[in-house]
Every structure is written in C-alpha cells, then in structure tokens.
Amino acid sequence: MDDNSLKEYKTKLGNLSVNDKKMRDLYLRKLALGEIQGPPTGYASIDKPWLKHYSEDQILKDFEPMSVYQLMYNRNIEHDNEVAIEYFGNKITYGNLLKKIDLTAKSLLELGVKKGDVVLISMPNTPEAEYLFYAVNKIGAVANCIDPRSGIESFNDEINNFNIKFYFGVDVIYDKIKNISSDIKIINISVFDSMPIVIKQIAKLKNKEPIIDSRTIKWNDFLKLGKKSTINSIKAEYEANKLSAIVHTGGTTGTPKGVMLTNEEMNGLIYQMMYGYSEFKRGQKFLNFMPTFIALGLNNSTHLSACFGLHSVMIPSFEPEDMPELLLKYKPNIFLCGPMHLPIIMRNEKVKKADLSFLEIICSGGEKLPLNIQESFQQFLKEHNAPANMWIGYGATETSAGIACMKNNCFKFESVGVPYLKNNISLYDTELEEEIRGYNKSGEIRINAPTIMNGYSGKNANETDDVISIDEFNNKWYHTGDIGHLSEDGLIYIDGRIKQIIMRKAFKIYPQIIEKIILKHPAVKSCAVVGVSDEEEFRIPVANIVLKPNFLGNKEIEKSVIDYVDNIINDELPEYCSMAGYNFLEKLPLTPIGKVDFKSLEKIGIINGKKRKLVKSKFSIN
C-alpha cells in the first residue's frame, strides 16, 4: 500500500460511524483469528491483531457516561452486606461505605466546598481517603491527591495553581502543613480513625496527637457538620468532560507532574477491565497498598476495587519486606505489585512452606519485570498450588494507569499483554515521524484510548503538547516515550525508554539489552544501566549492579560479573555497547513510589572515577 492509498484508507476509516467502527472491529477479530481471509495492511493501528483475544460481545460493549461516584454506586447499591473495606480487622460493608460517603459529602457542603472547587488531599491508604475521593466527586468538586512526603513548596504550588481553600491530610505531617497559606482550612485525619477501638486506643497511647491551631479541625469534628446538616439528600453531580481528580507522576526521570483526569477517563479504564477481564469476580479479596496520590492507587486499586465489588484490604503504610507477612495474614485473591516484591516473597521461609492456593490474580507493573524473576515466580506459584499466572501490566499516569495487561488466554513471558478493549496502538519511527509497518519491529509506543489525561496541570501545563498529539480525525494520541514492539498476535513487548537511550557519539545504546545480559549472571540480584555525561563521547553507559545478599562485597564475584558481561558484549554486540564503568551497590536508589531512581544513578556516575576503555568486539566499528 503506497502513501496515497494509505492516506485514502485512513480517511475512510476516520469517517466511519461509531456503529460501523464496531462492525469493522468484528471483521478484524475474525481476520486475526483466521476465520476469514483478507489482506492485512501491516499497520498495527489499522489491523488491530489484539482483537482476537476479545469476544464479539466484549467488542460491542458501550461505556455509559457518568461520574466515578455514580459508577461505583450503581455497582454496589444492591450489595449492602458485602465487605467493601477491611482496615486492621475492621470490616466496612458496601452499605456502610455509601453511608460514610454521603455523610462526608454533606460535611463538605457544610464546610463550604462547592461544585468545581479543587480540594487538596494528602493521605496514605485509609478508608477516609476513599470516602473523601467519592464524596468530593459526588458534589461535583475535584480531588487533588498529593504525596504526604512532598515538600511544602509542592503543597503551595498546588494551592496557588487551583486557588485551593480546603486541605485534608494525615496528621503526622501537620507540623509541615501548618505553614501553608493562612487562608486554607485544614482538616486533620489520623490513620487510627477507622481502626477497631482496642487497636486505636493502644496506637494513640504510643503516638502523640499534634497540637492544632484554630483554623484546623479533626476528622470526627468535620463529620459532625454533616450529622447536623439539614440536607436530606445529595444528587450526584455529573457534567461531561469535567475533572474528577488530579494525581501525580512518579518522577523517575524528572520532577513529578500533576495529571488532570476526567470522570470519563477514569471510568474508561474500569469499563475496559469490567468488559475485558472475566478473571475478576465480586467478593474477591484484594490487597490494596497502592497510595491514592498516584493513578495506579486511586484508579487501578481504590476505584477498580469498589466498582468490581472486591473486598479491599487497605494497608496505609507499606515496606516491600512486609509483603510475605501480609500475604499469609490476609490471604488475598488479588494483588498488584512491583518487581522488587517477588524475590522477597520467594525468599521468605514461611511462604516457602505455605499453600498459596488463594492467589488467583497477580500483576506486576511500574517497571520492567526481568524474565528470570517472572519465570522463577511462575514456577514458585505452581509449586505452591496457586492458580494464578504471573501477569505483567503496562500503563502510565497519563493514561489513568492503564494501557495493556496480560489475560489468561494470551499469557506469554516478557509480554505486558494486549491493549485494553477500546485502546488502539501504533508503533512510530520517531526520526521519520511515521508509523512502522510490520510486526516485531521496535518503535515508540503511541496509544489512542478513552483513558488519556485531560492534560498536565500548573507550571507543567505547556508540556501537555509534548506528549499528546491530535490526528486529522480528532483522535487523541499519547506518546508514551517507551520503545517497544508488537507481535503478530497483538501482544506488546517493552524494549526500553526513549529518555533512557544512551547516545554514545552517534550510536544508540538500549540499556535493557545490557541489563538482560547482566541479570543472567547467577550472582546478580538487580541492575540498572544509565547514561553518564562525558566530554568526549557525549553519554557513556555505566552499569549499577546489586549482588545477591551472600555475594555482597565479594571482589572475586564482582570481577566475574564484569568479565561475564564484557565477554558477552565482545561476542554479541558492537563495541560501543561496552560498559564505561561498573558500580556495585548495596541497593538501587528508589523514588518515593518504589521505582528505580535513574536521575540519582546518573548523578552517581562512575564511583571510582575511572572510565574504562572500549572493549574491542567482533563487531568493532574501527
């Protein structure tokens, strides 16, 4: 298909009605399954080979526009007695959850919060955080969720950006927060407020409450406003394409940005999960430790859990080392995790002896899951009677946390799964700025989806156009910045990030290729290859390696790893891929949300300060 024919064909597709697009998707599904014959174009965004993994009924589903509160309400109004939240043993039913949200909504109105106001919320994972999110949404206001660990400057930026008048936050940061603008009403919330009485009393004896000023009120006093209210009922507010929440990016390669999400964008992910994944069932127990100030926590954990009618076990404070104990204590059917959690689980002596048949869905996300860990954990699950497969998911804050995920009917190691039901994917050559034709060819992953953000907020607003483009048919495309490829079956594979590509002189080095080599050494626990500035070569690759505990500090093992990597590069890769330096660390630095902090690693440089010479390889460029 030449350029003119392709353009004409795309124009024809762009002018199809909504119903005609569905009919075409059914045709593409049959084409991908081999049920009918026809000439595919070779362009992923046109052929959509991933549709073979969805049923005809799923493809024909529509999304009903409504607020996030209304969707959650509709899904649970007839399930009053089922458990919605478990918090330190205190179980809150869906009936009580809806009542708590109503009371919170009345209290917000009595406090003076109005439709369209932005409310600043800085909370760990507690029931109050969930009540607030849905109550704020119910009255037509916007929840701006910010990490409690943020500096006071970040809080003031949000206050100034949105003219915020109301702040709800955890009391342990009150000494910091009391210095914000004097015009702000502060509501202090304790992580103990929803604990069972005995646990609450013990916890309060061990922890002093902060002394508050006159403009600050406690959560329970705030709720008294709603109890005294003369408002009988509150109609759920909904207006198309209005903001529902602001969450913040993880800041792995820069400072966190505020991401504005609408009701449609947040619900878009939930609808796609509801219609595309039969593995989720009402009443399943979900281990919920992702914080609500990130999209993965607010949308893909809290909102998803409530809309699916799951039994959400809320964990307000979490360290990776806690995972084995939490698994054995609560026996969840579902949990989301990061790659760092899996080795900790496999090493734990109690878990090694446990029956894990309760585990039905496990999904790793946030960053790439090394193949050796995925294979090991899949085998570990099998040996411990768990029916779950080790899924990998793929998303971004800018897409309401979701782009793609594995399904049990298309499970493949290293793949991050198939695009969600209504998503479209294209692979782009960023130098030629054109879509790549064919499969298993690397390019930038771009996504058209109902979940793409409204835009960045505040001082980052002008960066929105850097990552979102609008095509000639008014379709919004998010440029992920990830390099990946698509298989003929429509499965996505991540090869790296554009920002992490290392330009050494005129040559591109993809860090994940080197990281795969390093991780194959039996003494290596984890690693990250980063580019470090260099006057002669622009950027040079440096490997940061963490050895397994019994090898830490062993110089002979360190040398064996270096020799191993050098030899493979010499045999299999061009010489410009040879490492300019090796750093052996006790652990990799992490961002506040647990991702590898590449900026910190770049600043470390080469610890001994000695840049290694190029290792001459069989593919020498000189």
Regions found by a protein language model. Name each.
Residues 140, 267-285, 293-336, 344-349:
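Conserved AMP-binding/adenylation subdomain of ANL enzymes
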